């Protein structure tokens, strides 16, 4: 036994010696290149902004390896193209193999090898993968998991060998179709805690609870303050949007990865609300955006990316604004006729634009709705962090500040402090906008017909305001590429001069 012990100790010493030599060799290599090691002595911000054990050379070699791996896979798939084609046929005819699901799973393996990354919603996943068994999917990545109710992800997680969940419970919560009182009754009946069944429970919150690695965001180190691995560096917004978000939602832990100063302001517009929509706020926003369009016509260029988002906590406010702004060619629609740049805060999760207007709506008669809108930081956090460069609030300042609570108070404090520091970056002058007037009106519509005139063609346009306009022969002949642009059925945007 003594000999065995001595032999084991000698073996351990040899292993330690080998490891020490490896460390020395590695240290020698590090001394002669620009690879930065992890330095825990750095201050908080620098530590999070650092990128240890990585450099440009590593990135290039990583990319080369990836390209070579793709070539190997391409050749393998070419050599086995008959199997790939057979797998596609099996996948399209799953009902024939319902009693032999191992064949369906084998077909999935070939399909997933051919298409390594397959994107789906949970609703589509339940139909697409209903015949797959446990651990048949190698890696599952769930994005925006803070919005997903836990039960929606069960089937996908059950079928996956590895799961990575990405989300932020501090942003939009899951949308529930069931009243919170019913949730309380179900929770009591089945004896489960709020962690599993409540209006704040999500795939992200449950994954955070199950994660062995994470972070206590509160000093009390309670279970409720435990979150998964936080990515604290924020690279989207300039200040003060970053500061608003960091203060109301993240206890100051976020690190600014996009330094610089943006513009902000609170336009104090009051009025009587009809289902939370305040006509005066709509009129103000119409004139404000109209003025901005004249300064930058790209705002309504449908081929360009969105420059401005208009968002609101309330559905009716968003709808009324989308209709009002449609008249100046601002509102954009998808193929189903749904506005894409005007909507509720919930519809803009994950999106971004240089400029965001948050229209609060409500009046004293709907003060309860106003309190709800700012009762928790989630919606203000999402609204502020949609804006990359400029963030403006439109609403009754007195009404909302009287709602109380940390969210609106701290948001206002950040904007007020920013105003003192950078007065040139503040835009909150309501009067100059309301007094602004010109004789230019921009209309959006559809070309109803193109006809031949005496000297050139002319066109009749049906505006979205249901009025009929004419593009006369002079304008038609002066328009570059007119035959393609001014064609029947095309959507166009144009300006008209009022006649006094």
Placement of each model-derived feature along the sequence:
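Structural motif
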Residues: 118-119, 141, 164-166, 311, ...
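Short, charged beta-turn/beta-strand-edge "cap" motif at the junction between a beta-strand
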Residues: 361-362, 495-500
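The feature marks helicase ATPase cores and/or their adjacent C-terminal helical subdomains
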Residues: 1-30, 180-182, 189, 236-248, ...
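Conserved helicase NTPase catalytic core signature
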Residues: 4-138
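Conserved helicase C-terminal RecA-like lobe
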Residues: 294-309, 316-385, 397-403, 416-421
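Conserved helicase/translocase motor-coupling segment
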Residues: 246-326
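ASCE P-loop NTPase helicase motor core
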Residues: 90-91, 96-248
